[in-house]
Amino acid sequence: MVISKLATNCSRISNAQWYKTVMMCRPKYFDVCHHLLNAHMEMKIPVKKGLAAKQWENAYNTLHANNVKVELLEPQQGLPDMVFTANAGIVHGNIAVVSSFGAVPRQPETQHHIHFFKDRGFEVIIPSDHNVQIEGCGDFMPTHDGENYFVAYGFRSAFKAYAFIKDALSLPKDRLHHMKLMDPHFYHIDTALMSLTRGHLMYYPGAFDKESEKKILDIGSHKVIPIDRQDAMDFACNSVNFIDNDEHILVGNKFSNDLKRKLNDFGYKVIETPYEQFLLAGGSIRCSVLDIGKSDLYENE
């Protein structure tokens, strides 16, 4: 792995170009069969596979109807979690940092992710240190303006991932913020924090330690939207947000009436598309979508 040649490739994506092109994977082999990879996977309720397929297609069609281009990753038998493509890696400009899974059942996914990115012309970076577990955009969250980046650890990504991502993407240290997750129900940062296209940070306070929450409050300033545990458990933060025809659109599983009113008041169009079959595995719509906007969509600094 060569990191040094990335030093001149630091770029940021404008909020108007989030989720223009995404990676998804149909849930052909989706199931909950690995006990407690996260706190949601209790395996007490069986997955209704036909309903799961329908819910995925509804989410896919909703994105497509709002001019989001979808590139499909081929599902593989024996890899039931491939549907959660946000964990495949981190795409920054023309660079794809491929995930290094600590969870053994997901490790075979990596070779398929590498092929996907290489076939589309990305420069692929893979952690050479197997102790650097990184689970892609599950634990990497940029702010809407590309000025700040949150990197989480505590459950699925390693503490060391922070330094690796900083070097791999040539990100300034003062713009990359280390976040500690505390609640096992919010094992990835994208289950508890969401950066929105109008500059807001929506988050669940109970997911973070006090120091990490302070970073959210400092960066978000007057544009912070705290949510309660019920909205958090409905994966409100695990939604997809983009701009289409000047509308700031938020596509997610479920939002309380109070949260919907707040988001509407802030100028967001909320679209609910039920996704509860995937919540049984601890993921919602954002977990199923990876933003892969290529370098020609990016603004050089």
Regions found by a protein language model. Name each.
Residues V2-E301:
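The feature marks the mature, well-folded catalytic cores of soluble enzymes
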